[in-house]
Amino acid sequence: MTSFLHAYFTRLHCQPLGVPTVEALRTLHLAHNCAIPFENLDVLLPREIQLDETALEEKLLYARRGGYCFELNGLFERALRDIGFNVRSLLGRVILSHPASLPPRTHRLLLVDVEDEQWIADVGFGGQTLTAPLRLQAEIAQQTPHGEYRLMQEGSTWILQFRHHEHWQSMYCFDLGVQQQSDHVMGNFWSAHWPQSHFRHHLLMCRHLPDGGKLTLTNFHFTRYHQGHAVEQVNVPDVPSLYQLLQQQFGLGVNDVKHGFTEAELAAVMAAFDTHPEAGK
């Protein structure tokens, strides 16, 4: 086993899986979601987000930070490939907020070929991300540990949807075109630097739980969900409490020389928002 895979399985608290099967893919997908949180703090600090293998390994594994789709799915792709999976990245367009025009390709997801079938894997869409791979098949509802999803197809375009109560909500659309590392670098740069990017205006975090629950944070507003229902909502009273919550609930490492952050740095980030703890968001 390579040193990278050893560090990866250690980070996931997961026994090494050496055979590329659908069941192994499911196990790794959920373990990754539960161990490595979605978070955008580096965009706000601000720090440049690097996508090369060394940078992702240092930040997500050794510094015990999280990241967003370009980082999380980049790391997941490398781990799957090193295990022996046939995997490559795709790029999607986020349509969750019903944009008036088609947005650019700013969401990284994965296409995995295993056991003579194609599967979509995605550990990087925040609170609504998949926690299990989906078979690349249209109009079939597929259950995951954290909700029901389906894929729809319009020509060469696929649309990922999740069930919200009695309705289906579109998340993003994509095709199966081959993407290059430069495409990810461009999408990553746009996501981090476009003035209207959602990542530049909110502190966002999510960590999924093995029992079907999840923890989310939007600025000072912390929510614990179980089976799709909010069971705890807290307005974090101040930055010191928030600093502790990021470590205790989301497992963020704060002490790494390069990727850690101080309470004062977090305070500077939160002061830039037009939001107050008592307001909730």
From Swiss-Prot:
<comment type="function">
    <text>Catalyzes both the acetyl-CoA-dependent N-acetylation of aromatic amines and the O-acetylation of N-hydroxyarylamines. In vitro, catalyzes the O-acetylation of N-hydroxy-Glu-P-1, and the N-acetylation of isoniazid and 2-aminofluorene.</text>
</comment>
<dbReference type="GO" id="GO:0046990">
    <property type="term" value="F:N-hydroxyarylamine O-acetyltransferase activity"/>
</dbReference>
<feature type="active site" description="Acyl-thioester intermediate">
    <location>
        <position position="69"/>
    </location>
</feature>
<dbReference type="InterPro" id="IPR001447">
    <property type="entry name" value="Arylamine_N-AcTrfase"/>
</dbReference>
<keyword id="KW-0808">Transferase</keyword>
<comment type="similarity">
    <text>Belongs to the arylamine N-acetyltransferase family.</text>
</comment>
<protein>
    <recommendedName>
        <fullName>Arylamine N-acetyltransferase / N-hydroxyarylamine O-acetyltransferase</fullName>
        <ecNumber>2.3.1.118</ecNumber>
        <ecNumber>2.3.1.5</ecNumber>
    </recommendedName>
</protein>
<dbReference type="GO" id="GO:0004060">
    <property type="term" value="F:arylamine N-acetyltransferase activity"/>
</dbReference>
<keyword id="KW-0963">Cytoplasm</keyword>
<dbReference type="GO" id="GO:0005737">
    <property type="term" value="C:cytoplasm"/>
</dbReference>
<feature type="active site">
    <location>
        <position position="122"/>
    </location>
</feature>
<comment type="subunit">
    <text>Monomer and homodimer.</text>
</comment>
<dbReference type="InterPro" id="IPR038765">
    <property type="entry name" value="Papain-like_cys_pep_sf"/>
</dbReference>
<feature type="active site">
    <location>
        <position position="107"/>
    </location>
</feature>
<keyword id="KW-0012">Acyltransferase</keyword>
<dbReference type="Pfam" id="PF00797">
    <property type="entry name" value="Acetyltransf_2"/>
</dbReference>
